[in-house]
């Protein structure tokens, strides 16, 4: 076979794959095994999220060539953090993607103090989208991985003052969650409570195409992902765990500064991601509603676990929209190992207290 025949065969094979591919919207309907209004809503919601991901991916691919993509705006957000230009752009993209959809009554983002209401949607929009528009935005300026995280909740109760108090519920109230990873390829991972599924954006088609279904995380993995630069700001239990993995073979450290990127690696390879509280921030840095709870939902669907140290993260009820929480998430055995060091320190503290009394 000459080179032209080989090329022709390769192109023909690619075309065959494209013809038989499963798109994101089709996959949602197939998994719900229904064309009911609710199923069509969920398919449309995921399609809109995919649209936002495509627009953000396109902007990121040209970040060094267009104005308004790199650097800071000079503003401080509700979290007390400097705002990156891509944070603002991505936040506005999600709003624009849903504004004319008729699907959601409001959007809640870590970039906005209060939920963004879409009055024309509220009579019929039955859902709320919660999201982190750009996770790891400090990586944008140096061309490293970043991501978007999303969660969908059913619209419940009333919110007369538009502060989103009815959203202060545990993670079990989510009906869907996922993330988009912007890297060498753009990957969308989602769950609607029926397993975890992976899609890759095919630029030639402009569609997210199914790459893996019913993904499960290994019960144990080699990777531990934590910012060891904060070592002396942690409680003793986390330092004990870190010393343990340093001294025992079979553990390797990977930390990129982007939660989505580190989570994605662990979801595929197994291991544990840790973002603990510190002396300065005892509740940690990650926002429960926009980051931790959506990823916990995914992890449990993949057969893993998510913990705050002594209790399941999915059980935590926030006391305000931007509440933070520590996060220990990953393979069941690796999360249990971290928890064992926390339990040991708790037991030691109780024994010391008993001796003093």
From Swiss-Prot:
It comes from Acaryochloris marina (strain MBIC 11017). Its EC number is 3.1.3.11. It comes from the Bacteria. NCBIfam families: PRK09293.1-1. Its main location: cytoplasm. The keyword Metal-binding applies. This is Fructose-1,6-bisphosphatase class 1 1. It is found in: Cytoplasm. Belongs to the FBPase class 1 family. InterPro entries: FBPase_C_dom, FBPase_class-1, FBPase_N, FBPtase, Fructose_bisphosphatase_AS. Mg(2+) 2 binds at residues 132, 135, 291. Homotetramer. Pfam families: FBPase, FBPase_C. HAMAP family: FBPase_class1 (MF_01855). It catalyses: beta-D-fructose 1,6-bisphosphate + H2O = beta-D-fructose 6-phosphate + phosphate. GO terms for cellular component: cytosol. Gene3D superfamilies: 3.40.190.80, Fructose-1,6-Bisphosphatase, subunit A, domain 1. It is an enzyme of class 3 (hydrolase). Pathway: Carbohydrate biosynthesis; Calvin cycle. GO terms for molecular function: fructose 1,6-bisphosphate 1-phosphatase activity; magnesium ion binding.
